[in-house]
Regions:
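S-adenosyl-L-methionine-dependent methyltransferase catalytic module, highlighting the catalytic core
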Residues: 3-8, 13-29, 88, 102-103, ...
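A short His-aromatic
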Residues: 118-122
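Short conserved AdoMet
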Residues: 62, 66, 124, 138
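Conserved N-terminal segment of class I S-adenosyl-L-methionine
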Residues: 1-109, 113, 117, 130, ...
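Generic detector of intrinsically disordered, low-complexity, polar/charged segments
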Residues: 48-52, 97, 115, 138, ...
Length: 248
C-alpha cells in the first residue's frame, strides 16, 4: 500500500484551483511566536521547509529573520512561486528550491532547522514520514512540525462539509502523545508535542458552500472565539493545530 494519501495530480489541481496565493507574508504569520522563541534561544542560520509549496514559511524565515532558507516539495508551480516571492520583495535567488520525492531524494546538505507545516498528516505511516525529516537535519538541529487538529470541532466541520478533504488526512496522526513517542523512538531529544491555538475552523471549499452553511459556520466560529476568550485553554476539542518540536 502506498504511504501517501495524496498524489502529484491532487496537489497540481489543489494549487491551480487557488486564487490570491501571492500575498505579503506578515510578521504575525501563523506560529510566528513559536519561531521567535525558538530563534531567540538557538543559533539557527539555515532552514528547510519540507512539503511547503508555495513556501510561505521559508519566505517568513528569510524575510523576518534573515535565515538561508530552502523549499522542498515534489510539486512546485514555478509561476505561482515567482508571484509569491515578488509579493514579498524577494526573487528566486533568495529562497533555494528543490523539487523532488521525499522518499527517493538524497540530501546534499543538512540544516539547523527542518520544518513542515501540514505535511505529515497526508501519509499513512506517521513515524516513517517524521524519520524522513531527520536526514535533512544537522546534529543538534531542531525539528519543527505542525499539523491541523481534526479530532475536535474543526474535524466535525471537515467531516460534515468536506469529506473529500477529510479523507486526504491521516486522522490517527493527530495525537500529540503518539507523535512524542515516535520522536523519542527515533532518538530525538527535548521532545515537545502539544495542541496549539485556542480555536479556529476552516474549509478548503468554503466558496462552494451555500449561504446558509456559510452563515452557520460564521456563527460557530464566533461562538468558539467568544468561549475561548473566557476560557483560554488549548485542547483537543478546540485547538486548530498540533505542534511538535525536538532536537536531533
Amino acid at each position: 500500500m502506498s504511504n501517501e494519501l495524496t498524489d502529484r495530480k491532487f496537489w497540481a489541481n489543489y494549487w491551480e484551483s487557488k486564487t490570491d496565493l501571492a500575498f505579503q507574508v506578515p510578521a504575525t504569520y501563523t506560529f510566528n511566536q513559536l519561531f521567535k522563541k525558538l530563534l531567540a534561544h538557538k543559533p539557527i542560520k539555515t532552514a528547510i521547509e519540507l512539503g511547503g509549496f508555495p513556501g510561505y514559511y521559508a519566505i517568513f524565515l528569510k524575510k523576518y529573520f534573515g535565515l538561508h532558507t530552502t523549499l522542498f516539495d515534489f510539486y512546485v508551480h514555478q509561476p505561482v512561486l515567482k508571484d509569491v516571492l515578488a509579493a514579498n520583495q524577494l526573487t528566486q535567488q533568495d529562497v533555494k528550491v528543490i523539487e523532488g520525492d521525499l522518499f527517493k531524494y538524497q540530501p546534499q546538505e543538512q540544516y539547523d532547522l527542518v520544518l513542515s507545516c501540514g505535511l505529515i498528516e497526508h501519509f499513512q505511516d506517521t513515524k516513517d514520514i517524521i524519520d524522513r525529516h531527520l536526514q535533512f537535519l544537522n546534529p543538534g538541529g531542531t525539528l519543527f512540525i505542525t499539523l491541523p487538529n481534526f479530532t475536535g470541532v474543526n474535524g466535525w466541520v471537515q467531516r460534515t462539509y468536506d469529506m473529500d478533504n477529510y479523507n486526504k488526512h491521516n486522522i490517527s496522526s493527530m495525537n500529540p502523545t503518539l507523535l512524542a513517542q515516535y520522536c523519542q523512538q527515533l532518538g530525538l531529544k527535548d521532545v515537545e508535542a502539544y495542541y496549539y491555538g485556542y480555536y479556529s475552523i476552516w474549509l478548503e471549499n468554503m466558496k462552494q458552500q451555500s449561504a446558509a452553511t456559510k452563515g452557520f459556520l460564521k456563527l460557530l466560529w464566533a461562538a468558539g472565539k467568544v468561549f475561548t476568550k473566557v476560557v483560554p485553554v488549548e485542547s483537543k476539542a478546540l485547538s486548530p493545530y498540533i505542534v511538535v518540536r525536538a532536537v536531533k
